[in-house]
Amino acid sequence: MSDTIPSCEACRPDAEKVDPAKLEKYLSQVPEWRLEERNGVQMISRDYKFKNFALALEFTNKVGAIAEEINHHPELVTEWGKVRVTWWSHTIKGLHELDFAMAKRCEAVFNA
Amino acid sequence: MSDTIPSCEACRPDAEKVDPAKLEKYLSQVPEWRLEERNGVQMISRDYKFKNFALALEFTNKVGAIAEEINHHPELVTEWGKVRVTWWSHTIKGLHELDFAMAKRCEAVFNA
């Protein structure tokens, strides 16, 4: 068995950005997530609310664990009672379908 | 023994903001930290760099632990290879001397 870290499909230089029609469809599947743009790069993000800092940090760690599993990493903003998760694909400077799959996994982790 | 969560001295409504003279002195003691302002609220922040996501998240957890200990919480932005720590005192909408003490503790954690 190889012990190489699996490469993330969304992080390949030839990975395809989600096209506008699919973007709309995918966004409708994660209604709590909003589309944003930073320096021309499209991203999706959601704020998750918690009762205290410890629960927020626990969620950050859970999302960190799925990120490590897939080797695709979000930005995680942890504060007292809140975690903002933002997904995008650095290499293609935009959104890959994996970003939406990861958003769905975040929903599953939060609702578990 | 009381099991009440200790209140953070910087989070009392009558806590004092650091005055401009002290601000300059305190900033010089944490030269890696920069002063910033969001919506009129002064904050201090530093980007810490790491070799991967796991090490970044580990640092986030270490800073989270000292935050819980003091019951004063920063904003922690965790990404692949980077953690941005930002301290300020929400209640007084600015910087308390405790924010600088916490910045120093972050330095100690990072350099340990």
UniProtKB/Swiss-Prot annotation, chains A, B:
UniProt superkingdom: Bacteria
NCBIfam families reported for this sequence: PRK00823.1-1
Identification of the protein by name: Putative pterin-4-alpha-carbinolamine dehydratase
HAMAP family per the UniProt record, alphabetical: Pterin_4_alpha (MF_00434)
Taxonomic lineage of the native organism: Bacteria, Pseudomonadati, Pseudomonadota, Gammaproteobacteria, Oceanospirillales
UniProt cross-references to CDD domains, sorted A to Z: PCD_DCoH_subfamily_a (cd00913)
Enzyme Commission number, as recorded: 4.2.1.96
Regions that span the bilayer: none
UniProt keyword Cell membrane, yes or no: no
GO BP, one annotated term: tetrahydrobiopterin biosynthetic process
PANTHER family in the record: PTERIN-4-ALPHA-CARBINOLAMINE DEHYDRATASE-RELATED
Family: Belongs to the pterin-4-alpha-carbinolamine dehydratase family.
Uppermost EC category: lyase
Pfam families tied to this protein: Pterin_4a
Family matches, as InterPro entries: PCD_sf, Pterin-4-alpha-carb_dehyd, Pterin_deHydtase
Catalytic activity annotation: (4aS,6R)-4a-hydroxy-L-erythro-5,6,7,8-tetrahydrobiopterin = (6R)-L-erythro-6,7-dihydrobiopterin + H2O
